Amino acid sequence: MRRLKLKPKLLICCLMVNLLSSSNVIANDEQIFEDANSYTVEIITRVEIPFKEDEAGVFSGAGFLVDQERGWIVTNAHVVSKSPSKVEVAFKDQELHLAKKIYLDSYLDLAIIQISPEKFPKNHRQADLECNDRPKTGHPVGAYGHPWDFSFTGTKGIISGITSELGSEYLQTDAPINSGNSGGPLISLRTGKVIGINTSSYDDDDNQNTNFAELMVYVCRVLKLLREGKDPSPPKLSFTYLEEPLK
């Protein structure tokens, strides 16, 4: 079997290419998180009179701008609450502005809220959305939001898989998602596009970065229907189940 040996000059050249490639990856990740600053928002929700299964109080989460002409921001339904609530939104280093609920789907845990485009800061931008492809296992991602009130911060990880164990179909990721991250973007670190909405983490004391995000492909379908003036709400059946038969 013939063995090839790199000449010293060629070896140095290969090392330089690898070093340059690594630096480009680092710079790209930094730019992607920097871009997230301009479309991610902080959301404060105040609930005084909650519906059943909701709670009264003040809650915080994240969201991101998806339609700058309409002023639409995407987040989780549990961030803004299905109960009557006061929802306020702030871009980075900006003051809070009152937001209006446009659409809420508790099954998908999806909400679309709206603020006036006049309230946008000059450096705002609309998030690029991945509306067609599902990321494969191993795809590098970044979660962005406000974990434990550490505002506008990011974490990194990979896509661990896609699961339907939670009722709906979710992306599973080991990128840390904590309280305050809910509703924020899960971003592809290859393309810079938002591929999901950070939604939850596995509720177990032994959990080590088993976290979940709503697939952006479903969110894009809802946005498309809303832009067309159609109601994207799932159909409702007018009956209920009883745990015990009537006597």
Can you describe what each PLM-predicted range is?
Residues 28-31, 48-70, 95-98, 183, ...:
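A conserved glycine-rich beta-strand in the N-terminal activation segment of trypsin-fold
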Residues 2-12:
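Bacterial N-terminal signal peptides that target proteins for export
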Residues 64-65, 177-198:
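Catalytic nucleophile loop of clan PA
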Residues 35-50, 141:
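A short, Trp-centered hydrophobic/proline-enriched beta-strand micro-motif
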Residues 27-35, 99, 117-123, 194-247:
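C-terminal cap/linker of serine protease catalytic domains
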Residues 68-145, 149-152, 167-170, 230-234:
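Conserved active-site neighborhood of the chymotrypsin/trypsin-like protease fold
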